[in-house]
Amino acid sequence: MPEPRPPAPNDIRLRKILDDTLLAPRWPEGFFMRGFEAADALALHALLTAVFDDGADGPFDQWWPRISGDADFDPALCFLVIDAKGRLAGAALCWTRAFVKDLAVHLDARGKGIAEALMRHAFAVFQARGAAHVDLKTNTVENAAAVRLYERLGMIEVDWAG
């Protein structure tokens, strides 16, 4: 599979080296993480559509076959955060090649540390799978707050060739 390429001038690729300095995730009070089940696909799509609001994923009936049929998709690498009312508050959808495809937190749940906990969980899972690093792509203009989070987590910019 080809490496991701920057679709926009302000897109960057960031990397976290997985070493012995990793910290365990801390889930905010009233939220818990659980694994993905096929029945969660519609809610995950709705969250991604609401958060990214760019229409890039398309309708569910096109998105889900594309995601679930991708060679890098593993449902065990999709982490969901649920709030006290049972609603999907956040998610990290990761590829098997230690790449965070999507990280999304519902607008009502932002500012509580959910994204940071999801990233720390993903780092730990990939480290346990033997990965040396975790990568992601983000946009420095549209996702300035996310870039600050990633930098705080120790991620550094790397070349697209990786």
Regions found by a protein language model. Give the residues of each.
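A short beta-loop-alpha structural element at the N-terminal edge
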Residues: F32-A46
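Conserved GNAT acetyl-CoA-binding A-motif
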Residues: F126-T138
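Hydrophobic adenine-recognition pocket in adenosine-nucleotide-binding enzymes
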Residues: F36, L103-V105, N139
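Conserved acetyl-CoA-binding loop-helix of GNAT-fold acetyltransferases
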Residues: V105, G111-A128, V147-R152
